[in-house]
């Protein structure tokens, strides 16, 4: 048997064929079955040219079906192999994108699938030389995705799959392709473009030695169903057009050069594109193609109409919000609350009775303009408690007098005593009982009289008698009286509360044994007298007990009666965040529409009595409610809510949250066109925003500038600001005190400007200056105390030493621009009893006393340069050497040496060494240092000697002043004025700076006397400031008149007033 041997490469140059496809050499050349057609096709050679059979790699599964000739035998294809060979093995991939040079195998026709003729039967393929490509076919992919091939030879096939011999040299097979059926092929006519030379794409096809389809399919694991699905996920298929194929040429210049990979489309199936508009619209775009002549269809639907039947939308439409005091009448609110209460009573759920009580409370508050009267609330509580059972008294457990187990006699007892056998006497009448009580008192037996009165329930006589005796006896009789009452009796609750104790009902209510909680709360609210805090704690305890047992509405009723403020959802320790909703559950179940509406009505009731009494933490839930209104298509009502929230935020002042402002502005920006007034006020393309939205933008901008520190004007000094205000308070004191951002360190640090944000230049680590108290002369008035730290740096008043002759010298005081500096502010000797600062003065060889600058205290959490740090001492030396380039001052250099000497002598205990060690006396070069060290032996502060210079500096701020977080260094202020002090007998001048800040020593005064001159560079570059306890205020200003502690006075000298 001779087999058809496939040609390894190229196209067989066989004899020419006629139009009826018969071989002129007399041999039949059968055409392969469509099942075995594909990119890896077979070309069969004549047996005369190659007598050696060549094994086809796919002979095991793919054998050609043709009419056998006599003398030839071919093995039939088994059913399993027939089905296995029906699927290609190449996995589906994005054509032209992942591998532009990968050849994609043409899928086998679906007439060979297991489902038979259910699917569309694909194109049978011809040998390589006889195929006509079709452009845009979704079933045939080649190297170039646009170079699609279609076949015109499919028109030979008839309606059965067997071959029909038309003559001795021709045969036909059936085609089931509805796209390519053409009667021209039935008559043997040539198709357009049937014969054409080989293109470059065909020459680059893989040879027969490549991996077969079956093997690739087996390796990829692609099933038949997934492969079928991949055929529909091709890029947009186009209908076959005969006019296009007739004019198409096999080789196109554009197609051969276009090898750039293209990303596949995101959607393979036409779909509808939808979007939600800000005004409650739903925009739908139909999948039409305007390029094909189809008009673009855009549909606009109203969400209010679409969601008309939803329960949430009906609930929000029925609510008359937003509740503004000037727009909504309270009768409408009362009617709404009464309907809600009636619905809760009809539902008969476990918490429906308590929920109805909340709605009835809102009706009462709305009627009384938000005021709560205890008797009215008690009447509301007792409306449903009239049919309750009577409280049963409990019998006494023991005799309170002799503490025995003997029970008190019952008044109606007249039977025989089983223990003694005695028959008791007849029951005494009330008159006889009182007479016996009186007879006992005749003989002075008060204890027996009390026993008799308590046994016979003469509690009035017993309590009055006990009240005139000692307090222990009175408490004993009171306890005996209260124990006769039932534990769940409201009288028991009241008596325990009047006795100064939290009643037992406050911690046990809510159980079935205790019965209803309402009478207990009613008796507490109706009899509030004495300690109001005790009553409030009792009501809050009752609310906590009810909340612990799952009665959320009942607990919130108690919280509202106790005036508990509203909390936040994230803080689980808060008592309530929304009225009637438990904030310990998930947010969607917590922030319900009904809970938000109840809370808004409660806020409205409060505003009836106090117009500006908004609930700050509730504004974010109103914004959430407005967003839900917009989602359900109620855009105009949502815009009104934004306006109401904006009014509440603007009335809060500086305590507004910037995130809430930003989200409110975003929502209002989307909904502003829903206001007809805004549409009418349009001027061309510009839409005028409402005034409240403009104010919100301005307020949000101010908050952002305050956070970044840009609000400060660099041209204004603190003295100018304070002079205009007439006070020494900082303008941002309320902003920092009211905003609850203590936990947000990032925001807190942003409130304070850094050195880069300030306009002043050259910060120095030695000059961290919180705002000091201004020092005024006696003529200007008393000293202003306790000025807090500002949000910006204060230009310092610098003290410089002016070198002069040996007979006289002066100290220059440089003040801030606009500051008041006078000669009367130069204090030579501070008064006794003031917080004076003993200054360290170093005697110059020329007779000039150098005054060291006092270290101004830092606020807590700030770190400065510790005087006992070796790093600080080393860097001070470097700073001194750097300062030598400036105009030299021997006194300043000597002062730095003095500081270095102190630093080298310090111990290794850190800042605690201030308490443990004393500075060495060897480094003291002046008598003033000795006088400071010897202050332990002094009983009171004394004035400095006349030959030493003493400065009246500003005292430290009180401990209650706000701290300065996140700041370690501050810039120095440039001085604008220089003042020469008058010389005294010793040739020294004394001066005080306005701001109470001393400037750097050893620097020429020309840097501070000229406003335009820049101060010298900082002495320390890149140093890490350390914590210095000497710069922390130790004592408040109020204790300045008291004698300070010796150790504190010696180590932490206080500042003078």
UniProtKB/Swiss-Prot annotation:
It is a peripheral membrane protein. Liver, kidney, heart, spleen and brain. Pfam families: Sec16, TPR_Sec16. Residues 927-938 have a biased composition (Acidic residues). Residues 45-63, 704-715, 883-903 have a biased composition (Basic and acidic residues). The keyword Methyltransferase does not apply. Residues 263-708 are annotated as: Central conserved domain (CCD). Residues 1-86, 185-220, 704-778, 849-1057 are annotated as: Disordered. Residues 1-15, 201-213, 737-764, 1028-1043 have a biased composition (Polar residues). The keyword Cytoplasm does not apply. Its main location: endoplasmic reticulum. Residues 906-926 have a biased composition (Low complexity). It is found in: Endoplasmic reticulum membrane; Golgi apparatus membrane. SEC16A and SEC16B are each present in multiple copies in a heteromeric complex. Interacts with TFG. Interacts with SEC13. Belongs to the SEC16 family. Plays a role in the organization of the endoplasmic reticulum exit sites (ERES), also known as transitional endoplasmic reticulum (tER). Required for secretory cargo traffic from the endoplasmic reticulum to the Golgi apparatus. Involved in peroxisome biogenesis. Regulates the transport of peroxisomal biogenesis factors PEX3 and PEX16 from the ER to peroxisomes. This is Protein transport protein Sec16B. The lineage of its organism: Eukaryota, Metazoa, Chordata, Craniata, Vertebrata. The gene is Sec16b.
């Amino acid at each position: 048997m001779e087999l058809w041997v496939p040609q390894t490469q190229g196209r067989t140059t066989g004899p020419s064929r006629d139009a009826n496809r018969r071989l002129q050499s007399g041999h039949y050349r059968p055409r392969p079955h469509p099942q075995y057609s594909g990119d890896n096709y077979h070309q069969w050679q004549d047996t005369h040219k190659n007598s050696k059979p060549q094994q086809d790699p796919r002979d095991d599964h793919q054998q050609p079906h043709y009419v056998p000739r006599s003398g030839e035998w071919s093995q039939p294809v088994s059913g399993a192999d027939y089905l296995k060979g029906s699927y290609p093995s190449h996995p589906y991939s994005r054509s032209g994108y992942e591998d532009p040079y990968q050849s994609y195998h043409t899928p086998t026709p679906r007439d060979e699938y297991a489902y038979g003729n259910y699917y569309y039967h694909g194109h049978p393929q011809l040998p390589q030389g006889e195929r006509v490509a079709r452009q845009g076919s979704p079933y045939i992919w080649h190297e170039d995705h646009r170079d699609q091939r279609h076949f015109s030879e499919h028109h030979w096939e008839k309606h059965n799959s067997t071959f029909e011999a038309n003559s001795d040299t021709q045969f036909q097979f059936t085609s089931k392709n509805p796209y390519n059926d053409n009667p021209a092929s039935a008559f043997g006519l040539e198709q357009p473009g049937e014969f054409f030379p080989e293109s470059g794409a065909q020459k680059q096809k893989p040879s027969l030695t490549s991996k077969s389809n079956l093997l690739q399919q087996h390796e990829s694991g692609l099933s038949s169903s997934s492969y079928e699905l991949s055929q529909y996920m091709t890029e947009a298929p186009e209908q076959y057009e005969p006019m296009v194929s007739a004019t198409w040429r096999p080789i196109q210049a554009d197609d051969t050069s276009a090898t750039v990979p293209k990303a596949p489309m995101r959607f393979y199936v036409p779909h509808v594109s939808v979007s939600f508009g800000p005004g409650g619209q739903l925009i739908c775009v139909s999948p039409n193609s305007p390029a094909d002549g189809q008009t673009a269809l855009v549909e606009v639907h109203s969400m209010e109409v679409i969601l008309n039947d939803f329960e949430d939308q009906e609930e929000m439409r029925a609510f008359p919000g937003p509740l503004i005091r000037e727009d909504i009448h309270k009768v409408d609110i009362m009617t709404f609350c009464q309907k809600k209460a009636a619905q809760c009573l009809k539902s008969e759920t476990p918490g429906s009775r308590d929920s109805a009580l909340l709605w009835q409370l809102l009706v009462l508050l709305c009627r009384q303009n938000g005021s709560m009267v205890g008797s009215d609330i008690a009447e509301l509580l007792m409306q449903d408690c009239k049919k309750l059972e009577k409280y049963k008294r409990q019998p006494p457990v023991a005799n309170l007098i002799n503490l025995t187990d003997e029970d008190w006699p019952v008044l109606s007892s007249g039977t025989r005593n089983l223990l003694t056998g005695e028959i008791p006497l007849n029951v005494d009448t009330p008159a006889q009982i009182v007479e016996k009580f009186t007879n006992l008192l005749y003989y002075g037996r008060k204890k027996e009289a009390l026993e008799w009165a308590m046994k016979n329930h003469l509690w009035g006589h017993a309590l009055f008698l006990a009240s005139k005796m000692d307090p222990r006896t009175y408490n004993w009789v009171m306890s005996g009286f209260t124990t006769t009452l039932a534990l769940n009796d409201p009288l028991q609750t009241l008596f325990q509360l009047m006795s100064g104790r939290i009643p037992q009902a406050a911690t046990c209510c809510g159980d079935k044994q205790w019965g209803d909680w309402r009478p207990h709360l009613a008796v507490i609210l109706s009899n509030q007298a004495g300690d109001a805090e005790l009553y409030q704690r009792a009501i809050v305890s009752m609310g906590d007990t009810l909340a612990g047992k799952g009665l959320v509405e009942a607990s919130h009723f108690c919280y509202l009666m106790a005036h508990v403020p509203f909390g936040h959802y994230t803080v689980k320790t808060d008592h309530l965040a929304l009225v009637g909703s438990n904030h310990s559950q998930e947010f969607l179940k917590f922030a319900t529409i009904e809970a938000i509406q109840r809370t808004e009505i409660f806020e409205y009731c409060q505003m009836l009595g106090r117009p500006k009494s908004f609930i700050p933490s509730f504004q974010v839930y109103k914004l959430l409610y407005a967003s839900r209104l917009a989602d359900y298509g109620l855009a105009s009502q949502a815009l009104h809510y934004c306006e109401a929230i904006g009014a509440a935020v603007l009335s809060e002042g500086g305590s507004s949250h910037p995130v809430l402002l930003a989200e409110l502005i975003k929502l209002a920006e989307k909904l502003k066109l829903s206001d007809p007034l805004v549409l009418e006020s349009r001027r061309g393309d510009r839409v005028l925003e409402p005034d409240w939205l403009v104010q919100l933008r301005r307020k949000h901008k101010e908050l952002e500038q305050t956070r970044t520190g840009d609000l400060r004007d660099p041209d204004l000094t603190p003295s100018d600001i304070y002079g205009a205000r007439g006070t020494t308070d900082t303008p941002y004191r309320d902003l920092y005190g009211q905003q609850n951002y203590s936990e947000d360190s990032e925001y807190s640090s942003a409130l304070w400007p850094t050195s880069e944000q300030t306009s002043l230049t050259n910060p120095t680590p030695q000059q961290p200056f919180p705002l000091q108290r201004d020092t005024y002369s006696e003529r200007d008035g008393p000293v202003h105390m306790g000025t807090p730290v500002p949000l910006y740096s204060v230009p310092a008043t610098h003290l410089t030493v002016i070198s002069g002759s040996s007979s006289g010298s002066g100290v220059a005081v440089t003040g801030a621009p606009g500051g008041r500096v006078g000669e009367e502010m130069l204090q030579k000797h501070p008064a006794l009893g003031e917080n004076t600062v003993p200054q360290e003065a170093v005697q110059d060889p020329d007779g000039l006393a150098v005054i060291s600058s006092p270290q101004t205290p830092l606020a807590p959490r700030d770190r400065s340069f510790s005087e006992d740090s070796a790093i600080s001492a080393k860097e001070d030396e470097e700073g001194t050497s750097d300062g030598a380039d400036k105009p030299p001052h021997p006194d300043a250099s000597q002062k730095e040496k003095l500081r270095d000497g102190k630093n080298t002598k310090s111990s290794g205990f850190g800042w605690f060494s201030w308490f443990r060690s004393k500075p060495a006396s060897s480094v003291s070069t002046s008598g003033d240092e000795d006088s400071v060290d010897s202050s332990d032996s002094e009983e009171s502060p004394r004035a400095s000697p006349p030959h030493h210079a003493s400065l009246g500096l500003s005292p430290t701020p009180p401990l209650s002043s706000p701290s300065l977080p996140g700041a370690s260094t501050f810039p120095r202020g440039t001085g604008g004025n220089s003042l020469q002090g008058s010389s005294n007998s010793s040739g020294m001048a004394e001066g005080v700076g306005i701001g109470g800040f001393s400037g750097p020593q050893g620097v020429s005064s020309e840097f501070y006397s000229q406003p335009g001159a820049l101060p010298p560079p900082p002495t320390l570059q890149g140093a890490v400031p350390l914590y210095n306890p000497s710069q922390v205020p130790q004592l408040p200003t109020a204790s300045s008149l008291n004698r300070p502690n010796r150790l504190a006075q010696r180590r932490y000298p206080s500042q003078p007033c």
